[in-house]
């Protein structure tokens, strides 16, 4: 890693603190506020300089897409990050950013929850998943028929009940007003992002 300026070292230290304290990196806006920059754009320029020097790695288009090579945050057993927005109706493009954290032990859920997803829509209301709820999600790529999954179709994410027969998958709503989403695995991409392991209402 190339030598950092004092300002760059300060930003890197703040990123490490966020990773240690929260388990996830800060946004550009949070960096700007902490370091007294006038706008997130100024923070972005410093982050690009840190990336060029090999101090961090950046994921384009992600508000918290900052990684420090070789740095592993200590697992936090007292909270879970609230990530993005997931449609519980017609799928929408999910915003993959962490809104805040929720003070709850991941081990409260079984299997252990990895994050919370904020639900928008009423397509799963008949099993008690309502608009605004936080869905506890266990990360896995595998799902069995009948399980409630977080599924990604292309760049869109939705919460539905999973059913598969051969190369066809149905993502089924728990609300008669919503038709099932049919996916042919031969010509459509479908990724299981995780399983629902609980719901939090605040």
Curated annotation (Swiss-Prot):
The keyword Cytoplasm does not apply. It catalyses: Hydrolysis of Ala-|-Gly bond in repressor LexA. SUPFAM superfamilies: LexA/Signal peptidase, Winged helix' DNA-binding domain. Its EC number is 3.4.21.88. GO terms for molecular function: DNA binding; serine-type endopeptidase activity. The record marks 88-89 as: Cleavage. Residues 28-48 bind DNA. It holds the Pfam family Peptidase_S24. InterPro entries: LexA, LexA-like, LexA/Signal_pep-like_sf, LexA_DNA-bd_dom, LexA_repressor, Peptidase_S24_LexA, Peptidase_S24_S26A/B/C, WH-like_DNA-bd_sf. The active site is at residues 123, 160. The keyword Transcription applies. Keywords: Autocatalytic cleavage, DNA damage, DNA repair, DNA replication, DNA-binding, Hydrolase, Repressor, SOS response, Transcription, Transcription regulation. NCBIfam families: lexA. This is LexA repressor. It comes from Pseudomonas chlororaphis. The lineage of its organism: Bacteria, Pseudomonadati, Pseudomonadota, Gammaproteobacteria, Pseudomonadales.
